[in-house]
């Protein structure tokens, strides 16, 4: 007999494509990242925006297609970017760690309102008409006002990180990166997205063969060397 299931008792990652990292691992990493932010303003802003998103930040994909388009993809992408930024901050000590990490963690948080759900997601009316950059920027304004931080320089900087992270106006950013951390954020975002697209494409073909043309990678094909699994 067919009976409805209590969704709270079901692990959806058992049934759909999902992040290779468990939800518990991503949640643990998220808390560690927040604890690593020493600047009190950035930490309050990040925590406030995560409250806006709730569990959606952990559960949602980063896109309906293209990259990290699976259960948990948004948090996987954001955490991966933070980890790259942490390495870059060690190599380039002139970078503001707290700003760069906060920007990496929050840059796509508006996607939790831009998309309709964690599985078989579509773009919401708000998502289509406003986009995740505008949505996240609005949330940041609300959180900053609630915390009485709207006049802090850090708040202005985090606004800029969110607004400029697509790197170019023709890619959807209303402003170009004008802080060194914003330039790094744009480059790391692009790197992480492209490598995820390549990983997915290469994992689906046999060694010694080519991927189909990848639209998001300038319609190029990529070769999987023999001996690679």
Predicted regions and their residues:
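Divalent metal-dependent catalytic cores for phosphoryl transfer on phosphate-bearing substrates
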Residues: 66, 76, 87-205
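Acidic/His-rich, divalent-metal-binding segments that scaffold phosphate/diphosphate chemistry
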Residues: 9-129, 152
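Alpha-helix initiation and N-capping motif
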Residues: 23, 27, 42-43, 155, ...
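Extended acidic/polar, glycine-enriched regions
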Residues: 1-3
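Compositionally biased, low-complexity linear motifs
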Residues: 199-217
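N-terminal intrinsically disordered, cationic/polar leader segments
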Residues: 186, 210-215, 226-229
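Flexible glycine-/small-residue-enriched beta->alpha junction loops
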Residues: 5-7
């Amino acid at each position: 007999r067919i009976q409805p299931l209590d969704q709270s008792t079901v692990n959806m990652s058992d049934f759909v494509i999902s992040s290779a990292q468990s939800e518990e691992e991503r949640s643990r990493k998220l808390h560690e990242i927040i604890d690593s932010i020493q600047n009190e303003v950035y930490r309050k802003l990040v925590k406030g925006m995560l409250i806006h998103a709730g569990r959606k930040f952990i559960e949602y994909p980063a896109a309906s297609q293209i990259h990290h388009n699976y259960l948990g993809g948004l948090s996987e992408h954001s955490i991966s970017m933070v980890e790259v930024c942490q390495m870059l901050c060690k190599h380039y000590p002139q970078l503001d760690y707290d700003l760069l990490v906060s920007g990496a963690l929050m840059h796509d948080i508006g996607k939790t309102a831009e998309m309709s759900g964690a599985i078989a997601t579509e773009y919401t009316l708000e998502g289509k008409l406003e986009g995740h950059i505008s949505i996240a920027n609005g949330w940041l304004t609300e959180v900053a006002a609630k915390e009485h931080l709207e006049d802090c320089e850090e708040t202005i900087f985090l606004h800029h990180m969110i607004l400029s992270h697509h790197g170019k106006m023709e890619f959807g950013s209303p402003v170009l990166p004008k802080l060194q951390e914003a330039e790094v954020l744009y480059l790391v975002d692009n790197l992480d997205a492209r490598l995820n697209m390549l990983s997915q494409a290469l994992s689906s073909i046999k060694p010694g063969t080519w991927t189909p043309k990848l639209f998001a990678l300038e319609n190029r094909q990529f070769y999987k060397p023999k001996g690679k699994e």
